[in-house]
A protein has these predicted regions:
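Short acidic, glycine/serine/threonine-rich loops at helix termini
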Residues: 12-16, 44-51, 88-96, 106-108, ...
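Flexible, glycine/charged-enriched surface loops at secondary-structure junctions
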Residues: 29-38, 136-142, 176-180, 201-216, ...
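Short glycine/threonine-rich loop-to-helix capping motif typified by GTGT followed
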Residues: 47-53, 225-228, 242, 277-279, ...
């Protein structure tokens, strides 16, 4: 068993408790749990600093450390618990390399803060304070009330996007991606792990049996339906490569042509993941897509059953809910994730187009050579409405580290 253990981070404050429940569950199923930890970092803390250069690299460090410990100790199976942007794909990459019976447990989302706030409310508050729209006292009040407890960022940002992607992929138990970090549902999720991993060991079901090309296609469609993060492209490509699945950036464009956006979730929408969980989570959405013929139903999952079998008894969303639109009247008929190619990105770039931007945009290019140059221009009110901001030399090599 491996967990991301980090006392300094609100996001992972509850991981130790969940890890204890998982270990107890394993120990009561004729197995022996051995707990070890690896690193994690918070993009929310690192954002806007040189520390962000370490973020993407941490994904590989996490994958390497899991592979190293499990490989050296010859463990029969692995249960990984994670809940931040980079440690979830890091876990899946590590599990894929090891290719022994494995399950991923999502640490869970944070509850909404005061006035329906979340982490991005704090970031926007800093911008409002910088532009003299709110006072310092108002900013401090936002900071004190936006994050009421442990859990990952509550919107459909990278963490919840990857949690949903992993559930759709079949590598976590049904319902794991939407549960609150401190909920009874999350505790039950952890208590069910022992029986689940025992079943995988008995049947010798490995990540390579689950993480197939068709499963990745399911994952992409679910991400699109939820209005998920562009970072999913980056991480799914790496995860697929690990298990020998051919997945290209162009596949997101092709699959996206027939994949509707259905979820009104932040940052482009209104609602947060705990509110989606209250009406059923991600499973009813997957059943909607399956009934429209948009998912590959025969894919194997960590339950030992196929996707179709998992979804058989899932109930539909309540009739009057406003979070998930029906497939017949989507928020957007095709994907919000667009793959662009041109002289700025000859090998491709990913854009998130929600439909609110119109069909085209023309503006004056403002080119900067670093994040710091860009921030200086913003803080000094040198960016005007209609400008197109281009930040060069911030990729994986040039940054280095691909700072966000």
């Amino acid at each position: 068993r491996v967990s991301r253990r980090q006392r300094q981070m609100c996001i992972r404050d509850s991981i130790n408790d969940l890890a204890g429940l998982v270990c107890d569950s394993i120990d009561t199923n004729n197995l022996k749990s051995v707990l070890f930890n690896t690193i994690t970092i918070s993009d929310g803390i690192s954002m806007g600093t040189l520390g962000m250069r370490y973020s993407l690299v941490s994904r590989e460090v996490i994958a390497d450390s899991i592979e190293t410990v499990v490989g050296c100790q010859s463990f029969d199976g692995v249960v990984a618990i994670g809940g931040c942007d980079k440690n979830m794909p890091g876990c899946l990459i590590g599990l894929g390399r090891l290719n022994r019976p494995s399950i991923f447990v999502y640490g869970g989302s944070i509850r909404p803060g005061a006035n329906h706030s979340d982490l991005v409310t704090v970031m926007e508050g800093i911008g409002s304070y910088t532009s003299n729209k709110i006072s310092e006292d108002e900013l401090i009040a936002i900071e004190k009330t936006a994050l009421p407890g442990p859990g990952s960022c509550g919107g459909m940002y990278t963490a919840n996007t990857m949690a949903s992607a992993i559930e759709a992929l079949g590598m976590s138990l049904p319902g794991s991606s939407s549960q609150d970090a401190v909920s009874e549902e999350k505790k039950i999720d952890c208590k069910n792990i022992g029986a689940a991993i025992n079943n995988l060991l008995d049947k010798d079901i490995k990540p390579s049996d689950i993480m197939t090309r068709k499963a990745f296609e399911n994952s992409i469609r679910v991400i699109i339906a939820l209005g998920g993060s562009t970072n999913a492209v980056l991480h799914l490509l790496a995860m697929a490569h690990t298990v020998g699945v051919t997945l290209k950036i162009e596949d997101f464009e092709e699959i996206g042509k027939s994949s509707p956006v259905l979820a009104d979730l932040r940052p482009s929408g209104h609602y947060l993941m705990p509110e989606l969980n209250e009406i059923g989570g991600v499973q009813p959405l997957m059943k909607m897509l399956m009934e429209e013929g948009l998912l590959n139903t025969g894919c194997l999952t960590v339950t030992g059953k196929t996707l179709e079998e998992n979804l058989e008894d899932v109930k539909a969303y309540p009739k009057n809910q406003k979070i998930i639109s029906p497939v017949s009247s989507p928020l957007k008929k095709d994907s919000h994730l667009k793959i662009l190619k041109g002289n700025l990105a000859e090998e491709g770039a990913v854009a998130k187009i929600t439909g609110k931007e119109g069909t085209s945009f023309t503006g004056k290019a403002r080119v900067f050579n670093s994040e710091e140059e860009t921030l200086e221009a913003i803080y000094n009110s040198k960016i005007n409405a209609g400008d197109v901001i281009v930040v060069r030399y911030e990729g994986p090599v040039g940054g280095p580290g691909m700072r966000e």
